[in-house]
């Protein structure tokens, strides 16, 4: 994804459904350096904004103003499968099944943790 043009459907969706690091910093009450450390440690999913240095944090990884409990395990599973945060974002926003409207991120929000982890382990198709 990082080599794709900035004006693709994936990037438009990313910008539309994500929180900026400055907004998230204020919301969580931590500085942006701490956010970066959390992202590097695998506690948050952050995707670099196309052509920039800032990161965008998909809103679906948060519940009640905090990261969902599954996020660290999700990131760890993705890394074990060889996926970086950009590819993890792509996988999480793929449609589930043939012709389905739900995305894997919808399953995360619905608490279907095992289905989400299984899809991420496969590295692509939910």
Q: Model-found features: residue ranges?
A:
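Non-transmembrane "mature" sequence context
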Residues: 1-126
């Amino acid at each position: 994804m990082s080599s794709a043009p900035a004006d693709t459907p994936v990037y438009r969706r990313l910008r539309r459904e994500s929180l900026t690091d400055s907004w998230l910093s204020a919301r969580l009450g931590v500085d942006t350096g701490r956010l970066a450390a959390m992202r590097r440690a695998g506690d948050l999913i952050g995707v670099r904004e196309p052509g920039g240095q800032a990161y965008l944090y998909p809103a679906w990884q948060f519940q009640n103003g905090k990261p969902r409990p599954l996020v660290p395990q999700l990131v760890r599973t993705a890394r074990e499968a060889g996926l970086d945060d950009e590819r993890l974002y792509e996988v999480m926003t793929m449609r589930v099944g043939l012709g389905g409207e739900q995305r894997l991120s919808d399953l995360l929000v619905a608490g279907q943790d095992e289905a989400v982890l299984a899809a991420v382990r496969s590295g692509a198709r939910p």
